Amino acid sequence: MEQCLRYTDPKSDKFWRIETQGSQFVVNYGKYGTNGRYEIKEFDSPEACEKQAQKLAAAKQKKGYAPAALPADHLYFDDEEYGLNPLTSHPVFRRYFADEAVYYSECDEETAFGSDDGADTLCSLQEAFRKARPVLQDFIRYVIEGEWGFPCLPPQDAQSDAELKAQAQQENDGLEGVHYLLAHDRATLAAILGAIKISGRVDSRADITAAIAAAERIDRIAQLLQWADAPSITLAQIRQDLTRFAEETGLE
């Protein structure tokens, strides 16, 4: 079930939206034209969840709320208590990045938001979006250099395995290069996927290209440093989904 309702009178213009998924529902409400607040509720069963959602929607309509659509630029933000959740993700993100084990994990470091770097980037990105939409490539550089104090080291075209391994093992300010490389790539993945999760879009095809390159380098580093015996299935899934998103949404 999903319903979006709007109430207007001479003094106010408010929206209220509810959506169910399994035994959870999300309520998103506030002044129309803003992103409002998000709250997730959980029930013992899908039936109990659906029943309560229907009851709440009916009560709103009795108060004068009527069916309406959200503005096209409506943004989606996670509920702090529940964390990553499809119900607080943009419909476009849910369509193209559907694997919950890959896109909603908070502990798997191969996923977009499961590493500390990825989680911190998403948190900063949500704060940025609440103020004004950031330019994603500028935002990534700001997080890495401004918030973390690291050098910004994007993947290099045609870099050999030997060159990448040497870069990863070279020490800089007491840390091996791999620390900076992974920080860059995890921030890039989280920022690009996070922008789609929040707003349903990125700035350009170049953002998707950067995210795919970041995922590829994370995978290469893991094998070059013998952290993994084979390419990552998770990272392959992310690259595949990013490619499909770019192709089907007609990014330029």
Identify the function of each model-found stretch:
Residues 44-62:
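A short, charged, amphipathic alpha-helix used as a generic interaction element across diverse proteins
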